[in-house]
């Protein structure tokens, strides 16, 4: 095995800028051509009915209030999955009305076999991908770009999300709304009350985008009102007209909270008790523009990260989970450099860390040290929302001092102009480095193109972006740019092509970057065959290619070719996947892959076969298995993993996961194990208790996280949180306590 050689080449920032602008112009030209040939879907609309506050229904899930007789009625639904455009198998009727304060949505969801309704989830905010559920999609500005999604299941459990654009959802957003449901011999009914104070909208606008969806889990059937290419999102919605007289009050939410925390450090034998008050204030400057202030911000009740195994040379990505940064987070997204949830289109096999690489702003950099320990936030302010045809956002944070880093002022600003029918052109700027005392700024521009009516209803999306950082002590080679075009359709052909150029000194101190000095090139191509009514409902095959070349040398550094040989899906979404993966890594310096084991400098090519089996999560007992074997650097690797979820009842779930990597190299053999167990106890729809225990043999440590949550109603919460960390230090292989903490936290939303 020999290292490839190459000829050095220079790529100054001017050339980067010209190349990026050429990509922008190319995307714009393609956008114009696609828009000219696009087919519009058949529009649907209805006029909303208004009632008075005195007539407002009681939200109990029963649909028995007289005011529902005055509501607009929608009953013309079709399947978007299993069989697109087919008649729905179970009748569905939706009722919509509003008063001065709330939008009310009711649904009568008939079911010929009510005993078979899938309703296993009894914890607020839990994802309901495999539950019977009813969902409402709102595009309050009717601009076909962004929106809200509100869901409820037959147990009255709520879940909600923001549409960052028409292809990506932010499920960690939490909006304040009310929902209840009830079951009877004809199926189930649901009621929602969505406060206008929760939504951003134009008070002069009388027309919103709206859509409805139902999932019948046991049939894997999705029914909807308006849809395109088997999908529903703000760009493929109907319209509701006649909004008048909505009131948002003062538009002021005041959320005081207090936490009582006991910390025990067993290593240093210290004990500390803290009382931490905090305050969050949210104010609607206009119905479309929100301002917020935070003082002595407290993240003590945030869920812990799931541990991950890393056998690569580059850092992993952990998503944001803190509510302060999730509210209106869509405003700050840049260039679709986000590898999270999408709306059901084809996902590539590229790792999330490479998809996120190059983000100018990643809020997880704030309030956390490089080792992941919390850093206090003294105060913060944010303005975000929509002004005319612009989306704007600004965030300022005062972060407290930590070890050798002084207290820091951190700032990010974002402005996005809506262009074409579904596209946007934006700017971003950041200032400050939360993890050093060096000055740092980043400026960038991006163009995002979206067309979901391309070629008769196909999806076409693209983006082009450019950034430049300025870091104290670094000069030159500090730019980044990229572009990508994708047609992520879930039926027929799909494909994509992209390039990221990340120079050696590009340093977004408030962003995320785990690999620099490279050109990251991606290609994806495949085909999905739908077979309605068959035991194997869909078949897919394709190829994903990702290659990294050094910018200066042009030499190959890494390449992964994944042949998606076979992907088969049952009507209930059971999945079988067979992949053949060919990898190349070029090491220019020894790589410590495990404690005391170094892979020497050389070029390495290896092959791997991977089999994945996954059972439908709609069953009470579900899970998956992943098996792979093949070469690995100078030796070979056997990898096995599995997970299961046992929903014994809506009140008790047991979850387990195990991952094993057995690596044999001439330089040394090693095994990496990662295990986790989770217990979910749902006493009812307001009380839950979740315990997560994780272990890995790299850190040789166990972490236990237990959280009791009480939500008597939306906007009121109590948490009781226990954390305990143990390390394998005793001579007999036993574990010794490292640290433990207990927290009780209360918060209450006062809405004016």
Residue spans for each PLM region:
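N-terminal secretory signal peptides that target proteins for export/translocation
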Residues: 1-17
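Bacterial N-terminal signal peptides
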Residues: 17-33
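Structural preference for beta-rich elements and adjacent junctions enriched in aromatics
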Residues: 36-418, 426-427, 437
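A cross-taxa feature marking solvent-exposed loop/turn segments within ectodomains of secreted
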Residues: 41, 129, 143-145, 203, ...
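Membrane-spanning beta-strand positions in outer-membrane beta-barrel proteins
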Residues: 104, 189, 201, 253, ...
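Catalytic-domain carbohydrate-binding cleft regions of carbohydrate-active enzymes
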Residues: 270, 280, 290, 299-306, ...
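Exposed, low-structure sequence patches enriched in small/polar residues
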Residues: 376, 453, 457-459, 464-752
């Amino acid at each position: 095995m020999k290292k490839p050689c190459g000829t050095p080449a220079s790529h100054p920032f001017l050339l980067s800028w010209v190349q990026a602008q050429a990509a922008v112009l190319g995307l714009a030209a393609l956008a114009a051509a696609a828009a000219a040939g696009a087919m519009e879907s058949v529009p649907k609309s209805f006029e909303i009915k208004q009632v008075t506050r005195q007539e407002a229904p009681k939200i109990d899930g029963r649909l028995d209030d007289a005011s529902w007789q005055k509501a607009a009625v929608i009953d013309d639904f079709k399947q978007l999955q299993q069989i697109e455009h087919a008649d729905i198998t179970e009748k569905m009727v939706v009722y919509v009305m509003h008063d001065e304060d709330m939008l009310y949505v009711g649904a009568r969801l008939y079911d010929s076999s009510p005993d078979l309704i899938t309703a296993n989830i009894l914890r607020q905010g839990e994802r309901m991908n495999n539950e019977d559920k009813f969902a409402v999609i709102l595009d309050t500005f009717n601009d076909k770009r962004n929106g809200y999604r509100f869901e409820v299941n037959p147990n009255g459990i709520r879940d909600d999300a923001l549409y960052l654009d028409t292809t990506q959802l932010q499920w960690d957003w939490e909006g304040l709304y009310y929902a209840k449901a009830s079951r009877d011999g004809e199926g189930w009914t649901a009621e929602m009350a969505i406060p206008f104070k929760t939504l951003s909208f134009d008070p002069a606008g009388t027309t919103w985008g709206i859509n409805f969806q139902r999932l019948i889990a046991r049939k894997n059937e999705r029914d909807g009102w308006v849809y395109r290419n088997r999908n529903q999102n703000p760009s493929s919605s109907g319209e509701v007209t006649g909004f008048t007289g909505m009131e948002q009050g003062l538009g002021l939410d005041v959320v005081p909270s207090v936490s009582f925390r006991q910390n025990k450090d067993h290593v240093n034998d210290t004990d500390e008790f803290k009382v931490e008050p905090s305050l969050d204030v949210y104010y609607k400057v206009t119905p479309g523009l929100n301002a917020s202030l935070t003082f002595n911000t407290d993240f003590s009740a945030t869920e812990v990260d799931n541990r991950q195994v890393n056998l690569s040379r580059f850092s992993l990505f952990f998503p944001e989970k803190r509510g302060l940064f999730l509210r209106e987070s869509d405003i700050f997204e840049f260039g679709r450099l986000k590898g999270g949830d999408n709306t059901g289109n084809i996902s590539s096999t590229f790792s999330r860390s490479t998809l996120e690489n190059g983000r100018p702003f990643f809020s997880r950099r704030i309030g956390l040290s490089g080792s992941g320990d919390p850093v206090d936030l003294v105060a913060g302010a944010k303005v975000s929302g929509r002004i005319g045809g612009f989306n704007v956002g600004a965030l300022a944070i005062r972060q407290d001092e930590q070890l050798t880093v002084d207290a820091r002022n951190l700032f990010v600003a974002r402005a996005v102009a809506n262009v074409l029918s579904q596209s946007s052109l934006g700017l971003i700027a950041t200032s400050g480095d939360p993890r050093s005392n060096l000055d740092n700024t980043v400026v960038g521009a991006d163009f995002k193109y979206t067309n979901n009516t391309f070629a008769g209803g196909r999806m076409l999306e693209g983006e082009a972006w450019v950034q430049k950082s300025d870091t104290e002590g670094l000069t030159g080679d500090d730019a980044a740019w990229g572009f990508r075009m994708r047609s992520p359709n879930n039926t027929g052909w799909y494909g994509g092509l992209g390039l990221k150029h990340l120079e050696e000194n590009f340093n977004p101190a408030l962003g995320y970057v785990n690999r620099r000095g490279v050109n990251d090139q991606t290609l994806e191509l495949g085909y999905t065959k739908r077979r309605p009514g068959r035991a194997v409902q869909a078949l897919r095959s394709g190829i994903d290619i990702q290659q990294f070349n050094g910018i200066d040398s042009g030499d190959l550094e890494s390449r992964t070719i994944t042949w998606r040989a076979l992907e088969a899906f049952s009507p209930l979404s059971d999945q079988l996947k067979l992949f053949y993966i060919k990898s190349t890594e070029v090491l220019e310096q020894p790589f410590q892959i495990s404690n005391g084991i170094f892979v020497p400098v050389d070029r390495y090519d290896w092959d791997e076969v991977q089999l994945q089996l996954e059972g439908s999560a709609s069953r009470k007992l579900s899970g998956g298995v992943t098996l792979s074997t093949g070469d690995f650097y100078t030796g070979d690797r056997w990898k096995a993993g599995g997970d299961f979820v046992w929903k014994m009842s809506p009140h008790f779930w047991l979850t387990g996961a195990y991952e094993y990597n057995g690596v044999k190299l001439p330089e040394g053999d090693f095994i990496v194990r990662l295990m986790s167990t989770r217990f979910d106890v749902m006493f009812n729809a307001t009380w839950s208790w979740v315990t997560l225990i994780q272990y890995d043999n790299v850190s040789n440590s166990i972490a236990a996280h237990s959280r009791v949550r009480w939500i008597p109603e939306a906007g009121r919460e109590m948490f009781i949180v226990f954390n305990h960390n143990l390390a394998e230090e005793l001579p007999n292989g036993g574990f010794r306590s490292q640290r433990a903490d207990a927290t009780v936290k209360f918060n209450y939303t006062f809405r004016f």
